[in-house]
Amino acid sequence: MSQLDLGTQQLELERYPQQEESTQLQAWEAADEYLLQQLENVNIGDRPVLIFNDNFGTLACALHSHQPYSISDSYMSQLATRHNLKLNELDPQQVTLLDTLAELPASPAVVLIRIPKALALLEQQLRALRDVVAPDTVIIAGAKARDVHTSTMQLFEKVLGPTRTSLAWKKARLIHCEVADIVPPAAPVTTNWVLDGTDWVIHNHANVFSRSNLDIGARLFLDHLPHDIEGHIIDLGCGNGVIGMAALMQNPQAQVSFVDESYMAVASSELNVEHNLPQDMDRCQFEVNNSLAGIERESVQAVLCNPPFHQQHAITDHTAWQMFCDAKRCLQVGGELRIVGNRHLDYHQKLKRLFGNCTLIASNKKFVILKAVKSGARY
């Protein structure tokens, strides 16, 4: 837990999922403070306040009295926002949580943006704003100074209007943007490409990992998926859904769930199945979730997973470990977790410790495919 002193307000903030107390990672950054300082002399009135990419709900908590809209592609960020509102005894009904594909309220007074890691996501969000902002809307974006690039500035200017940067403060920097009467060049809603060796056209929304091609780990994984399973298969951390789609093809008697914490990932998966395997839509479920929360114990025959090792800009194996533990809980006895991962992440030892077994299915210089089977022993 970390404390943020805003002068008139003190907040207790935690990262979510909660970390071990020994972690040095806190739930807020200097960019959050810097953004909030800019609002001291702004007359917000009754018009909407929009907040983008508020990773752990810091800005939403600080501005809860203005009934802000918090927009994020991350379900985990939404859970973090609810958690920190509750932690500070703030009414969660004061904050409206929206995903990045949702319609935005018109004519906002203020827009605060935490600049995301993916420039494509930022562009999608700025284009959505272009449709609703007023000429006098105050637009301020913030990030660590090292993450504010010339390309970032150019994107604001292309989509919204004139832009200037602030001085650096505590290694954070702001972008101030004015709304101009411009028409940005047209851009497709999704990035589309043909998957090698197939006739599938893959549609990726802006925040999907490796959005313009298939990453090399997934390419290896495609060649080593289980066959002829009857029952429930989960593509966990599904991204654009290519792994789950291959599982649909190779397991014609199975039901396949596409699960991710990214709204855009799940939307991309559904779009890709609908366009490429429409006859199999009745065998599919699409779910935005925190790993496998709420999935019934011992109800799944196989979990396929390409686990992330970043949470926002931080490197962590917390998400992968949660996925592995959830998979073990949900798997039937004899069911398997099959993953692809970078060699250096040592997933083999983690799976062996958790499941009591782990088999190397395939490998190359960078990636390994591992399988762990749930035994009948108590756990």
Curated annotation (Swiss-Prot):
Q: Which SUPFAM superfamilies match?
A: S-adenosyl-L-methionine-dependent methyltransferases (SSF53335)
Q: Recite the UniProt keywords alphabetically.
A: Cytoplasm, Methyltransferase, rRNA processing, S-adenosyl-L-methionine, Transferase
Q: Does the keyword Transmembrane helix apply?
A: no
Which InterPro entries does this one have? DNA_methylase_N6_adenine_CS (IPR002052), rRNA_m2G-MeTrfase_RlmG (IPR017237), RsmC/RlmG (IPR046977), SAM-dependent_MTases_sf (IPR029063), Small_mtfrase_dom (IPR007848)
Q: Does the keyword Transit peptide apply?
A: no
Gene3D superfamilies xref list: Vaccinia Virus protein VP39
Q: Which GO terms describe its molecular function?
A: 23S rRNA (guanine(1835)-N(2))-methyltransferase activity; nucleic acid binding
**Top enzyme category:** transferase
Q: Which Cys pairs does UniProt list as disulfide-bonded?
A: none
* Enzyme Commission designation: 2.1.1.174
**Where, per UniProt, does this protein localize?**
Cytoplasm
Per the record, its GO cellular-component terms are: cytoplasm
One Pfam family matching this protein: MTS
The protein's annotated catalytic reaction(s) are: guanosine(1835) in 23S rRNA + S-adenosyl-L-methionine = N(2)-methylguanosine(1835) in 23S rRNA + S-adenosyl-L-homocysteine + H(+)
Q: Which domain of life is it from?
A: Bacteria
Question: Of which family is this protein a member?
Answer: Belongs to the methyltransferase superfamily. RlmG family.
Function according to Swiss-Prot or TrEMBL: Specifically methylates the guanine in position 1835 (m2G1835) of 23S rRNA.
HAMAP family reported in the protein's UniProt record: 23SrRNA_methyltr_G
Question: What is the name attached to this protein's record?
Answer: Ribosomal RNA large subunit methyltransferase G
Source organism per UniProt: Serratia proteamaculans (strain 568)
Gene, per the UniProt record: rlmG
